[in-house]
């Protein structure tokens, strides 16, 4: 799956 980590300028997959 794709887990969205909002720990950057944009969502990282």
UniProtKB/Swiss-Prot annotation:
Catalysed reaction, written as an equation: Hydrolyzes the link between N-acetylmuramoyl residues and L-amino acid residues in certain cell-wall glycopeptides
- Report the activity regulation comment: Inhibited by phenylmethanesulfonyl fluoride (PMSF) and EDTA.
Q: Which GO terms describe its biological process?
A: defense response to bacterium
State where the protein is found.
Answer: Secreted
Recite the UniProt keywords alphabetically: Antibiotic, Antimicrobial, Hydrolase, Secreted
Enumerate the transmembrane spans.
none
EC numbers on record: 3.5.1.28
In terms of temperature dependence, the annotation states: Optimum temperature is 65 degrees Celsius.
Q: Name one GO cellular component term.
A: extracellular region
Q: Which domain of life is it from?
A: Bacteria
Q: What does this protein do?
A: Has bacteriolytic activity.
What is the name of the protein in this document?
N-acetylmuramoyl-L-alanine amidase L2
What organism is recorded for this protein? Lysobacter sp
């Amino acid at each position: 799956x794709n887990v969205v980590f909002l720990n950057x300028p944009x969502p990282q997959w």
